[in-house]
A protein has these predicted regions:
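N-terminal Rossmann-like NAD(P)+-binding subdomain of aldehyde/semialdehyde dehydrogenases
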Residues: 1-127, 321
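Residues at or immediately preceding the N-termini of alpha-helices
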Residues: 27, 41-44, 63, 259, ...
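Conserved C-terminal structural/oligomerization subdomain of aldehyde/semialdehyde dehydrogenase
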Residues: 29-35, 215, 252, 306, ...
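Residue-level signal for inorganic ion chemistry
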Residues: 30, 66, 88, 163, ...
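Short, well-ordered beta-strand elements within core beta-sheets of diverse protein domains
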Residues: 33-39, 54-60, 140-141, 251-254, ...
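Structural signal for hydrophobic packing residues in well-ordered secondary-structure cores
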Residues: 55, 59, 74-81, 85-88, ...
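Rossmann-like NAD(P) dinucleotide-binding subdomain of oxidoreductase/dehydrogenase enzymes
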Residues: 120-261, 389
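ALDH superfamily catalytic-core signature
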Residues: 225-368, 432
Length: 471
């Protein structure tokens, strides 16, 4: 059993004022594997005060001093790779291929921030003026459970690169990852108060951070509903806000697509992170003339996807992170059937060979129209919908007929045509005949998928304001 009973404030591990204990589960077994003591409002206040006190000195550090600090962070986090790998499997249930990436990503994203900082121009000319990019102040960083260690390191690295100090509220469901990352960051020997990590509930710690007048910036990744609440809270003191929220991403198969080449990309995009990904391509838009062919190929591919023990090398989809999430996904599968969608693969219940744990059968629906609940709501599980279209104009209309706009993918034989379609999709990122990631490019969403951008120089700039100096 793991017991985590301290938070990190002003350069040291301290016992929280909060007294609530939160059970940690292994989602592959549904058994309790530990407990974490949660911080409360008083702890959040102490962390904010520490970050505020550290800001004047940190904001005056040079670029080279910040690069040196980030390099120490990178070395310290990279050294804990194996510990992170075990934690990701144990408390999150990520299968082997995904957990390996999740354990490497925290160090990788710090390295990416170092590269962005090295190229970042803090002072630029603008006619007769000089524009100075200045750090905002204390940044509140609120991270989700589906890749918590990576989000902690990515947001913190960008904030520190900009000259901000930080208070981090990680997900209480990811306490093992958080503990490992916190220990690593402590070992990087950053000045006290520059970063503070307080694990607690959103309605206490998160609420305090998003309302506090001494917090100048909020960076949040999570659900759209929580993002709306944070935006309302932040408006009281005109905080700058970056929100990376939900998605219902379309994967468009054009009528000239090579189906054999496309299907593996469709499956990877739809089932990434066991379907628990904001960018997952869960609406599969297919040409009516090739609907039967594509449905058959997809049904075979989905039926072949292995869901089960994350420690088994053949497993491609692990469990949902919690019983609550499992019940949510089961409810959406049931809703799809009730609304008239046709099951091509999967369905309610657990996959064959699994008894315990929060496993979901990889599920594929056909005969879906874009007004159905399963085509509108972000399910956050391994559930895909096939939606037919008549022509190019209709597929663009269907793709954009959503409150979200985070990611999309276009697959087609004519690359120029595919890019032309991509340019008409209302989305922060559109992939054309690839499933790739570019850390130098801005990442974020349109519409209800968020506000602002992260990654690369965009991520650093999000923690700063321009000051114009003349004369």
């Amino acid at each position: 059993m793991h017991t985590i009973e301290q938070i990190f404030i002003n350069g040291e591990f301290v016992t929280p004022h909060g007294t609530e204990w939160f059970d940690l589960y292994n989602p592959a077994t549904a058994r309790v594997i530990g407990q974490v003591r949660l911080a409360d409002e008083d702890d959040a206040e102490r962390a904010i005060a520490a970050a505020k006190a550290a800001f004047p000195a940190w904001s005056q550090t040079t670029k080279q001093e910040r690069i040196a600090a980030l390099k120490r962070m990178h070395v310290a986090v990279a050294a804990r790779h194996d510990d992170l790998l075990e934690a990701v499997i144990e408390e999150y249930g990520a299968p082997a291929s995904r957990s390996a990436w999740m354990a490497s990503y925290p160090a990788e994203v710090i390295a990416q921030a170092i590269e962005a900082l090295e190229a970042f121009a803090f002072v630029t000319p603008a006619g007769a003026a000089t524009v100075q990019m200045t750090p905002l102040g204390v940044a509140g960083l609120i991270t989700p459970w589906n890749s918590d260690a990576g989000f902690i390191c990515g947001k913190l690295a960008a904030a520190l690169a900009a000259g901000c100090t930080a208070v981090i509220k990680p997900s209480e469901m990811s306490a093992l990852q958080t503990q490992i990352v916190t220990e690593a960051l402590r070992d990087a020997a950053l000045p006290p108060g520059v970063f503070n990590i307080v694990t607690g509930r959103g309605e206490t710690v998160g609420e305090t951070i998003s309302r506090h007048p001494d917090v100048a910036k909020i960076s949040f990744t999570g659900s759209t509903n929580t993002g709306k609440a944070i935006l309302r809270n932040a408006a009281e003191s005109f905080k700058r806000v970056t929100l990376e929220l939900g998605g219902k991403s379309p994967t468009i198969l054009l009528d000239d697509v090579d189906v054999a080449q496309a299907i593996p990309l469709v499956i990877q995009a739809g089932f990434m992170n066991s379907g628990q990904a904001c960018v997952a391509g869960t609406r599969i838009l297919v040409p009516l003339a090739r609907k039967a062919e594509i449905e058959t190929a997809l049904a075979q591919a989905v039926a072949a996807v292995k869901s089960g023990d994350p420690r088994d090398s053949v497993t491609e989809i692990g469990p949902m992170v919690s019983e609550k999430q499992w019940l949510r996904v089961q409810g959406y599968i049931r809703k799809g059937i009730e609304e008239g969608a046709r099951l091509l693969a999967g369905g309610e219940g657990r996959p064959d060979g699994t008894r315990d744990g929060w496993f979901v059968r990889p599920t594929l629906f056909a005969d879906v129209n874009n007004r159905m609940t399963i085509a509108r709501d972000e399910i956050f599980g391994p559930v895909l919908c096939v939606i037919p279209y008549q022509d190019e104009a209709e597929v663009i209309a269907i793709a954009n007929d959503t409150e979200y706009g985070l990611s999309a993918m276009v697959l087609g034989g004519d690359a120029d045509r595919a890019r032309r379609v991509a340019q008409q999709i209302v989305s922060g990122r559109v992939l054309v005949n690839t499933l790739a990631h570019e850390p130098k490019a801005p990442f974020g969403g349109f519409k209800h998928s968020g506000v602002g951008r992260e990654m690369g120089e965009w991520g650093i700039r999000a923690f700063m304001e321009p000051r114009s100096v003349l004369g």
